Amino acid sequence: MSLGAVDEGTAELLERFGFDAEEFDELRAQVASGALSAASNVVSGVVGPPAPEDVVALPEPGSDAWREGHEAGLEALAAGRVAQVVLAGGMATRFGGVVKGVVEALDGRSFLGWKLGETGRLGTDLGVRIPVALMTSFATDAGTRAHVAGLEVDEPLWFSQRISLRLTGEGQIFEEEGRASAYAPGHGDLLETIRASGTLAALRGRGVEHVAVSNVDNLGARLDPVVVGAHLVSGRPMTTEVARKEGDMGGAPARVDGRLGLLEGPEFPAHFDQDRIPVFNTNTALFALDALDRAFDLRWLVVRKSVGGREAVQLEHLYHHASWELETTFLEVPRSGPRGRFFPIKEPVDLERSREGLREMLSASVLD
C-alpha cells in the first residue's frame, strides 16, 4: 500500500508512528480471504484450566517467602536494576476524548501524577532514581507529553506504539467522513517498539535488568518490593499478575495441548466454561530486560468495533501473548485493600466507584 492512497494528514501520522505498509497489506488480504476472522481468534487444540501449581500466590506478609521476596525486591530496586514501563497509549475515547492519563484520579492529581509520583516517592525513600518509560500512541502522545511536562517528576523515556488503519469486513480500508480511519493496534506493540525506539538499549545503559509493565489507569500496580522479589526468586523471564475473579471476564492462564500460557477471552472455544479458571489477567507484568531483546511472533486477533454507527474491523495483538514464548510465572495478587493491585478505571463511573479503595491503597506504603 502506498501512503499516497490516503489523505495527507493521515499519511503524515502513518509515517510518524511507524506504519508498516507491507505487513498491513498482508493482514488485510487475510481479512479479505477469511483467514483472519472472529473464528480464527479461537485457538486450536485441547483447552483446559491451569493446574493448581501453575498459579503461585503472592506470599503472605510476615511469612518466610514474603521476607525473602521483600529482601530480593528491595535490593534490586535500591540498586536501580528495576524500571517502570507505563502503557499510556490507546485511543483516548472513554473519557470524552480526553487522554486518560491526564484525567484527575484522586485528590486533585491525575493518573499520571499518581503513577509517576508514587514511583518517584519510592525512589526518594530508597535513595535512587527509578527509570520510567511511557508508551504512548498517536492519539495520546501530545497530550501526555504536555501533561508530564507540568508534573514535578523526573523526565521519563518516551516511545510510542504503532499505528494502523481500520478495515471493512471485506478487507477494504474503512473510512470516516471520507478519510482512512486510524487506530492503535494493541499493547503488543510494546514488545517491538521498546527495542526499535532504542528504549530497551537506554534502560540497559542505565543498569536496568528488569521492567515492570502496567496500565496507566491501574494505580494499584505500584512497584512493590515483594512483587518484584517474587519475580526475581522465580528465576523466570516473565511474571504475569492475575487476580481472583469477581464476575470479571477477559484473559486468563490456560493450558492448550498441555502448554501453559495466557489466552484472551475471544481465544477460548465457545464450549469452554471460562468459570473453570478462577483468576484473570490484570495486564500487569514483569520481564527480564534481556528476554525482550528479541522478536516475538504474536497472534493477531480480529476485533469488531462500532465506529460512527458502522462496524469496523481492527487487528490487535497483546503483549501477554509473550507467555507462550517465555517461561512465565502466573502470580496471584490481592485485587483490593491496602496491598491491592487491581483498580482498573475504564469509564468515569469506575472512578467514582473506586475512589475510597484507591485512597486506602495509596495511603499505604509498599515499604511497610
Go through each PLM region and give its residues:
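Terminal amphipathic alpha-helical/low-complexity segments used for targeting or macromolecular assembly
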Residues: 1-76, 116, 126, 268-269, ...
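Domain-scale recognition of functional cores that engage charged ligands
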Residues: 58-86, 96-320
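Glycine-rich N-terminal segment of FAD-binding domains in flavoprotein oxidoreductases
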Residues: 89
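Glycine-rich phosphate/pyrophosphate-binding loop regions near the starts of catalytic domains
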Residues: 93
